[in-house]
From Swiss-Prot:
Name assigned to this protein: Na(+)-translocating NADH-quinone reductase subunit F
Cofactor mode of binding and number, as noted: Binds 1 [2Fe-2S] cluster.
Domain FAD-binding FR-type: 130-270
GO terms, molecular function: 2 iron, 2 sulfur cluster binding; electron transfer activity; metal ion binding; oxidoreductase activity, acting on NAD(P)H, quinone or similar compound as acceptor
2Fe-2S ferredoxin-type domain span: 33-127
Subcellular compartments: Cell inner membrane
Catalytic activity: a ubiquinone + n Na(+)(in) + NADH + H(+) = a ubiquinol + n Na(+)(out) + NAD(+)
Length: 408
């Protein structure tokens, strides 16, 4: 009997020791209680929060919206903050976006920083002007086979003080979207049916945030206008996931409510007299339209400028009347379209081929000084890479190549 008692006692003692070890480790490794996040050395900006969560989310919960085009996934590298103390060691996931020198200076991706202890951070003052709005959908119309123009109404008495080339972030709740419910006009449905896209569904169990560039310019007041390309899986493997945000946006109808935050941006025009060359493709049309309308309508710029847009066929061209009007009203502006796959019904007599080749063969090859021009581009990744390679071969420096890189 004594042996039984001794055995039970030893087992109980071991369990108690293990519990004490776990509690001690937890006290050292897991933060508890209130945490203070000091911001810019300003006591009025400090945040008191509980332990846990990512710094990006904690800041957003307290009305401070740091840019994150990927919605906190660690892939865009935009949600940078400078951490003066606290925050722990930089993670391998951050090193693709932050150099060793930047890391030594305290640069971190806020979406990767766990809030576990008091910290001091520095933010750009512009961040404190970023706000959140609940907007009404005015319209959501196809402009091309796979591109919709989403037009949002800003609440009465409010404005989004953005600059041309800027962007907003849009929020999508958890959702289940059936592509069969999309409003796709008859002239675009052929490709959708051919590829089997109407069979697709998008099921998302958590909130999603993504960034989109404005297609409107600052003096188109009271609205936000976006060009959104649907992100489908490749036709040969429709079992792959659909684009979370684009599926949600394509499901929106007039009168629906949408939450956005902003404005953000870095893709701004330089204040010089240099010639401006704009190159776009697909939904990369959005910042091109914003920039050109801003330059020619608001600023009344006399700088020489041209716009080169690549599309697959005539059916994929949009805002044609807008740019024809700008060209008619401004002798310093021309625009050109190249079709990579014109159809017989297009009766197309304009440029054909890929836009980087067309731009080179028909303009830059004989240009006196292409290295003195400023090049603004936004389009599919392959287009961007081809244009940049061509410009480098012409001797254009990095400082004159400006890219809105959201993957087209």
């Amino acid at each position: 009997m004594l042996e039984v008692y001794l055995g039970v006692g030893m087992f109980t003692a071991i369990v108690l020791v293990l519990v004490l070890v776990i509690l001690f480790a937890k006290s050292k490794l897991v933060a508890s209680g209130d945490i203070i996040i000091g911001i810019n050395g300003d006591a009025d900006k400090a945040i008191t929060t509980g332990a846990g969560g990512k710094l990006l989310s904690v800041l957003a919960d307290n009305g401070i919206f740091v840019s994150s085009a990927c919605g906190g996934g660690g892939s865009c590298g935009q949600c940078r903050v400078n951490i003066k103390s606290g925050g722990g060691d930089i993670l391998p996931t951050e090193l693709d976006h932050i150099s060793k020198g930047e890391a030594r200076g305290g640069c971190r991706l806020s979406c990767q920083v766990n809030v576990k202890s008091d910290m001091e951070i520095e933010l750009d003052e512009e961040i404190f002007g970023i706000k959140k709005w609940e907007c009404d959908v005015i319209s959501n119309d196809n402009k091309a086979t796979f591109i919709k123009e989403l037009k949002l109404q800003i609440p009465d008495g409010e404005s989004v003080p953005f600059r041309a080339g800027g962007y907003i972030q849009i929020e999508a709740p958890a959702h289940h979207v059936k592509y069969a419910d999309f409003d796709v006009p008859a002239k675009y449905r052929g490709d959708w049916e051919h590829f089997g896209f109407f069979k697709l569904e998008s099921k998302v169990d958590e909130e999603t945030i993504r960034a989109y560039s404005m297609a409107n310019y600052p003096e188109e007041f009271g609205i936000i206008m976006l060009n959104v390309r649907i992100a489908t899986p490749p036709p040969r493997n429709l079992s792959l996931p659909c684009g979370k945000m684009s599926s949600y946006i394509w499901s929106l109808k007039a009168g629906d409510k949408v939450t956005i935050s902003g404005p953000f941006g870095e893709f701004f025009a330089k204040d010089t007299d240099a010639e401006m060359v704009f190159i776009g493709g697909g939904a990369g049309m959005a910042p091109m339209r914003s920039h050109l309308f801003d330059q020619l309508k608001r600023l009344k710029s006399k700088r020489k400028m041209s716009f080169w847009y690549g599309a697959r066929s005539k059916r994929e061209m949009f805002y044609v009347e807008d740019f024809d009007g700008l060209a008619a009203e401004n002798e310093n502006f021309q625009w050109h379209v190249a079709l990579s796959d014109p159809q017989a019904e297009d009766e197309w007599t304009g440029y054909t081929g890929f836009i980087h080749n067309v731009l080179y063969e028909n303009y830059l090859r004989d240009h006196d000084a292409p290295e003195d021009c400023e090049f603004y581009m936004c389009g599919p990744p392959m287009m961007n890479a081809a244009v940049i390679s061509m410009l480098k071969d012409l001797g254009v420096e990095d400082e004159n190549i400006l890219l809105d890189d959201f993957g087209g």
